[in-house]
Amino acid sequence: MIASLRGTVIDKGLDYVTIECAGVGYQCSGTATTIAELPRGEEVFVTTALVVREDSQTLYVFKDADEKRAFATLQSVSGVGARLALAILSVITPQELARAVSNGDHKTLQRAPGVGKRLAERMAVDLKGKVADLGEIADTGAVGAAGAVGDGGDGQAVAPDVREQVLEALVGLGFTESKAGTTIEAVLSQWSAPQAPDASGLLRASLAAIK
């Protein structure tokens, strides 16, 4: 089991990062927020989880212990595998997950791609008592935390290839192309930062805004 890595970030995309440790490059999957916080060319220390299947071995990287525990705990729910658990955490933070389960908030759980009404209800029941200590259960204001969505700005100047990358990433997570495209345009229309977003910034903001 590979529980953690310390090394240099030598490559990364919207949903993966490659960390070189003692001359060996480890490619890890992770949420957009986690990947974005790992600076290319710098040394990082991350916690990881290796998921072994009959036809694959995938190393997942996490930004903190809460995210790693949420990833493992989500998979205790029937119908939730590693890929869906990561998709859920791409949209819902561990703290939001804890709050939604505590309040029986099925609507928040259904924000994640691949989580319908029945699965949301099952998650609320099966996770009861298992996720309450995942950070502080409090309102976090995800869109505001992104620090970029406001009353409008220069977001529409984003390069076409950035739009395409983010669209592909959202579709890969399980969102329909229509919903992904609509969300991207909505985020860009409200972008208030001085500069147009890069792919990571636009993806994080879109995940925070998608419903």
UniProtKB/Swiss-Prot annotation:
Listed GO CC annotations: cytoplasm; Holliday junction helicase complex; Holliday junction resolvase complex
Region (Flexible linker): 143-157
Region feature (Domain III): 158-211
Residue segments, region Domain I: 1-63
Main location: cytoplasm
The entry's keywords: Cytoplasm, DNA damage, DNA recombination, DNA repair, DNA-binding
UniProt-listed Pfam families: HHH_5, RuvA_C, RuvA_N
Entry comment, domain topic: Has three domains with a flexible linker between the domains II and III and assumes an 'L' shape. Domain III is highly mobile and contacts RuvB.
Family in the record: Belongs to the RuvA family.
Protein name (database record): Holliday junction branch migration complex subunit RuvA
Organism name: Corynebacterium jeikeium (strain K411)
UniProt gene name: ruvA
